[in-house]
Amino acid sequence: MKVEICVDNLESVITANQFPIDRIELCSALAVGGLTPNLGFIQQAQQISTIPLALMIRPRAGDFLYSEDEIQIMLNDIATAKQLGIQAVVFGALSANGEIDLATTELLVKASQGMEITFHRAFDLCKDPITALEQLIDLGCHRILTSGQAATAFDGIPVIQQLVKQANGRIQVMAGCGVNADNVKQIIEQTKVPEIHFSAKGQRQSLMDSISSARMGTSSQDNVLDIADSQKIKGILKYISLL
């Protein structure tokens, strides 16, 4: 069983490195599903982490239908990842009708040669997951991240189970979204997934002495930071170790 944690700040990278985790998915803006992190964050994470890093390649929030300019941004970021020696990249691209964007994905896969490739939860928006899985196998992706096309991986157990059987080792199926200590054992036992993905999201108060009433965006929680919670990580890993 391989374990991946997704993080969007250096504090969480440091926390993750205290545990037997196999891979860290490095993102920014997990609140919108994860975007490509900035160069400074990537480089500092590389300095600190002994755990392999997977870099999110997603140029903006929203859907996964990308323009030519946005695709070029993704190619640029993949090239940067390769230059930095990043071990894996994570991306996904769809067509307007809810199918894998074959041409774009082929471009991204070719650009990513030498790194592991995860097709992220854009997969969960595909109208036909069975066909989509076969296409991603043919394109050369190494794994998919999926909640079984449901709101959470727990809710998507039946579909994930079907995908694992269909994959039959040709591609790794990694279950993610809403994975926690209360459901991880059941998800793994029922689906037989070889990999699990989670954020172990917690929060801590800002260490600033005082907080202005001014806000930096739409959130009213500028005085609270989302971080990977070490106790939640322990809880998840405890159940995985019993399997």
Swiss-Prot record:
GO MF annotation, one: copper ion binding
Top-level taxon: Bacteria
A GO cellular-component term linked to this record: cytoplasm
Keyword terms, alphabetized: Cytoplasm
Family annotation (InterPro entries): CutC-like, CutC-like_dom_sf
Cleavable signal peptide: none
Main location: cytoplasm
Classification via SUPFAM superfamilies: CutC-like
Subcellular location: Cytoplasm
Family stated for the protein in its record: Belongs to the CutC family.
Name of protein: PF03932 family protein CutC
Lineage: Bacteria, Pseudomonadati, Pseudomonadota, Gammaproteobacteria, Pasteurellales
Name of the gene this protein is made from: cutC
